[in-house]
């Protein structure tokens, strides 16, 4: 058994899930608008900077403020769809990781 082949099979399985397809489709749709893509990248960079420069309690407050600043942006249909589908994909992946962990601990 070659683990690399199993990894490729697993990745292909993930690519064929509705969660991945929906996330990818909404990402492509979002990226069609360069301004929205740029705003999303700016938000992500600001969020990452906050998490790397502040303690957790302070970071949480800063993130809440950042999210308020971007609330109109988050409510745009293409952004909202991307965020929703990304959360669904991440949830699916989290469940996969938990299943793998469960199998490893048997």
Residue ranges: model-predicted function:
Residues 1-106:
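Terminal, compositionally biased segments used for targeting/anchoring and flexible tails
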């Amino acid at each position: 058994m070659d683990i690399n082949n199993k990894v490729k099979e697993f990745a292909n399985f993930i690519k064929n899930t509705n969660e991945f397809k929906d996330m990818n489709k909404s990402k492509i749709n979002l990226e069609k608008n360069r301004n929205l893509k740029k705003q999303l990248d700016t938000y992500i960079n600001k969020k990452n900077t906050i998490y790397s420069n502040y303690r957790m309690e302070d970071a949480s407050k800063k993130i809440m403020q950042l999210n308020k600043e971007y609330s109109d942006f988050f409510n745009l249909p293409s952004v909202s769809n991307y965020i929703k589908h990304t959360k669904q994909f991440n949830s699916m992946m989290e469940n996969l990781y938990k299943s793998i962990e469960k199998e490893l601990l048997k």
